[in-house]
Amino acid sequence: MQYQGKPEYFARELARLAAEGVRILGGCCGTTPAHIAALRAALDALPGQLPVAAAAPIPTAAKPEVETDDAFLRKLNAGKKVIAIELDSPKDADLTGYLDGARRLQAAGADLLTIADCPIARARMDSSLVACRVHRELGLNVLPHMTCRDRNLNATKALLLGLYAEGVREVLAITGDPIPTAERDEVKNVYQFNSRKLAQYIVSLAGEGREMPSPLTVFGALNLNARNFDVELRRAQEKLQNGMSGFLTQPVLSAQAVVNLKKTRETLGEKAKILAGIMPVVSQRNAIFMENEVNGIHVDAEIIERFAGLDRVQGEELGLEVSVKAAQAAAPYADGFYLMTPFNRIALMERLIARLKDEGIAD
């Protein structure tokens, strides 16, 4: 390899730097003996004593940003039953109504807002951007979901750094629903990670000399309704080994889900934080759809039958009662509750939060 620049140009430019005070000059692998000889001659031709550049002050390393006060984690680690509530981001570019709903849920007593990452692989407003806006404007703790479906390593890292800079300190790492078969010619799955590897990568970004001064808290998903729950539980143990701190479960809508939740607590111990999923059923049609069409949800037949013939008001009342009883059954084995908002019914969720608090099920 050889520089294209002529020796005369090389010598003239470096001699100019020497006249400004640079004291150590030379060439890299592309220079030839002719370049160095020309430089020596140019330096010898400079008049008088070469000036010495004043030493520039060495900049001190900036101190890491002061840690944000994480009220959610503080309450969770204190052993109090927390309330996290999921509110799907908008399908369009208008966030006004969403922020109004988030304010109402915050005022009702929600400790954390979770935002799904394009559920069922349908595009919505980005969960992380929505989370940052909510956290910035409302001061409410947020838990953006982060799937492995849509981002490679570079995009994932860039997003995580942005979340940290915005004060977001919790993420939910999930594999994510695959792109529907009919759309795969236009939309591609990425899946560079699975949820366990994603969690491991997230926690690896923190520490001395790393990109983040302190680690993000990573949660994962736990399906209490899995047909082979022993396999699901083994995966949960692997997720903990890869850096996850706890789990948000699928809805508790069956007696078996409570049994599996109890088994989870006995197997994982108190170290793993578990938020039991509570999703109000609002009609028989809704219950039948969840039982037959939504992966990871099982609704007991008795619950489905109880909704027969009910109108909207009656359906919400029964859904509220079923949800409160599910939370009561789950409470001994959970560190809090993960409430899922059906059909954007904020008023229903306000009532559910109030009931959980009034009856001492949540703090």
Features from the language model and the residues they span:
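Domain-level signal for soluble alpha/beta catalytic cores
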Residues: M1-D363
